[in-house]
Amino acid sequence: FGIGTGNTAMRTLGRPPMRVKPFGQYLRLVRGLLHGEEVSYGDGDQATAIRFQWAGKGHYDISEYIPIHVGGFGSRAQALAGEFGDGLITGIPRGGSVTQALANVKHGADRAGRTLDDFYTSALVNLMMLEPGEKLDSERVIKECGPSIMANVHYLVDAVRDVGIEVPGYILPIWDD
């Protein structure tokens, strides 16, 4: 089961993705529900106990373990993958190096007293095998990789504007304020 903050989907709808703190609360709920537990939903006086009502009655099956793979491109979301998830889905270079991402995952796992024995990590990367003599700006390369690259550029524009991150060095050659 893959789950993230909705960065791509929500931004496509003109909405911001879920913030990291509510995302952690959401992961706690999902993890508990998939374990068949009753979990507390809401805050303070508004909190209520919830659970799956129709589990095991032919509607859905949670008797088998359902692994959660957490989408995490920033350090705090990667730590949440270690705290609540069975795997991390990240991106390179946006999610940092694999070494950095795994250090963040370990931080979250340590915080929760979990081990990473069977933890699965995957990374979204752009890869293009060039034909002999083909250039990176060939029509084929642009057609195949352009949309994915531009989705990442749009993410960075939003992150610089909304969060205030510094423009990464690798994007500076095409960055125009």
PLM region spans:
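Flexible glycine/proline-enriched surface loops and loop-helix/loop-strand junctions
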Residues: 13, 62-66
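Hydrophobic faces of well-ordered beta-strands that scaffold small-molecule active sites
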Residues: 1-3, 68-71, 88-90, 119-126
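An alpha-helical appendage that flanks or caps ligand/catalytic pockets
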Residues: 16-59, 98-177
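Solvent-exposed alpha-helices and their adjacent loops that cap or buttress functional pockets
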Residues: 2, 59-63, 82
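Active-site-proximal loop/turn and secondary-structure-junction residues that shape catalytic pockets
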Residues: 5-9, 94, 125-129
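Glycine-enriched alpha-helix->loop->beta-strand junction motifs that scaffold or abut catalytic
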Residues: 80-89
